[in-house]
Amino acid sequence: MVTQNKKILIITGSFGNGHMQVTQSIVNQLNDMNLDHLSVIEHDLFMEAHPILTSICKKWYINSFKYFRNMYKGFYYSRPDKLDKCFYKYYGLNKLINLLIKEKPDLILLTFPTPVMSVLTEQFNINIPVATVMTDYRLHKNWITPYSTRYYVATKETKKDFIDVGIDPSTVKVTGIPIDNKFETPINQKQWLIDNNLDPDKQTILMSAGAFGVSKGFDTMITDILAKSANAQVVMICGKSKELKRSLTAKFKSNENVLILGYTKHMNEWMASSQLMITKPGGITITEGFARCIPMIFLNPAPGQELENALYFEEKGFGKIADTPEEAIKIVASLTNGNEQLTNMISTMEQDKIKYATQTICRDLLDLIGHSSQPQEIYGKVPLYARFFVK
């Protein structure tokens, strides 16, 4: 229990929505605990430090999944044995130093790979606990911060990845990845489908088109899925693509087995009410699906964290990788046409899922902050070369 005024500084990043969602889940949980003596502040470090350059990098990152896959692959897998080598290791250093001087946090929580934090822990000799919430299922070296107090990871296999590169096992906790509590709340699946004019006795295939960043080929996929899966109905989430929603709505408006939606705040209900989902393997999306025990098909995952997540889920029996739309259609047909494999996948997910990750992490954070010392004067520990950057 926090009995003295304490402050948690959360460093996150807006490269994709997942890191921000994790941050929000943790903030919401801490707020729900009504801790009068605790304040929580969030900062998108790279965006605040270098807004123009970071905006350019974000656009490249998003487009890399479509146009620059080999380039991103080279970036992601470069020098995996050199844990301290990262070309943007000092990116955001000035901003981070100023944040620590201004805010004087009692604990720093990273929900985004932040290599610059290792500069502080290795060279500044700060005495502030640093914790990290890893939002993927396989380790990448940029998640490692030397002398961290805690790492919160998704699975025991992820913990082994950390141990294998020399991280103290006692600092790594297998908690699962934090998501919104609503994904662990019971849903009346039958009523939800009825309310949306769908048949609760049919197998519902959920497709998240917005996840792929493309707007072509989905009409053929839907048509072929329905042709090869006799007892199926399809829910297509088009995201923010109004053009895709218009074209698909026009094509399937008279088909009672197809529901076309735009952006929705009800992914929780749709995941809970579907038997299979076609999506990209972003860490948070698949964790939400994992919580709802919905087997997933990963269509042409991009090299990097997406592919690593997909390979892990396939290895564990939670999902399958399809390199092409045609392969995805075949997998759907195989799983929905009286095959026990789908039931077995759901059962495996039920057995292996970790519940209430957000609550577990927040309780441990409070324990860490309860044992932390008063924040020291950061400036006194800053090396001479870095003091020129401090405002």
UniProtKB/Swiss-Prot annotation:
Q: Provide GO CC annotations from the record.
A: plasma membrane
List keywords of the entry alphabetically: Carbohydrate metabolism, Cell membrane, Glycosyltransferase, Lipid biosynthesis, Lipid metabolism, Membrane, Transferase
Task: Tell me the compartments it is located in.
Answer: Cell membrane
| Main localization (coarse) | membrane
Q: Which reaction does it catalyse?
A: a 1,2-diacyl-3-O-(beta-D-glucopyranosyl)-sn-glycerol + UDP-alpha-D-glucose = a 1,2-diacyl-3-O-(beta-D-Glc-(1->6)-beta-D-Glc)-sn-glycerol + UDP + H(+); a 1,2-diacyl-sn-glycerol + UDP-alpha-D-glucose = a 1,2-diacyl-3-O-(beta-D-glucopyranosyl)-sn-glycerol + UDP + H(+)
> Which EC class is the enzyme in?
transferase
Q: Which GO terms describe its biological process?
A: enterobacterial common antigen biosynthetic process; glycolipid biosynthetic process; lipoteichoic acid biosynthetic process
Identify the NCBIfam families for this entry. Answer: PRK13608.1
**Role description:** Processive glucosyltransferase involved in the biosynthesis of both the bilayer- and non-bilayer-forming membrane glucolipids. Is able to successively transfer two glucosyl residues to diacylglycerol (DAG), thereby catalyzing the formation of beta-monoglucosyl-DAG (3-O-(beta-D-glucopyranosyl)-1,2-diacyl-sn-glycerol) and beta-diglucosyl-DAG (3-O-(beta-D-glucopyranosyl-beta-(1->6)-D-glucopyranosyl)-1,2-diacyl-sn-glycerol). Beta-diglucosyl-DAG is the predominant glycolipid found in Bacillales and is also used as a membrane anchor for lipoteichoic acid (LTA).
Q: Which family does it belong to?
A: Belongs to the glycosyltransferase 28 family. UgtP subfamily.
Name of the protein: Processive diacylglycerol beta-glucosyltransferase
Q: Which organism is it from?
A: Staphylococcus aureus (strain bovine RF122 / ET3-1)
Q: What is the lineage of its organism?
A: Bacteria, Bacillati, Bacillota, Bacilli, Bacillales
Encoded by which gene? ugtP
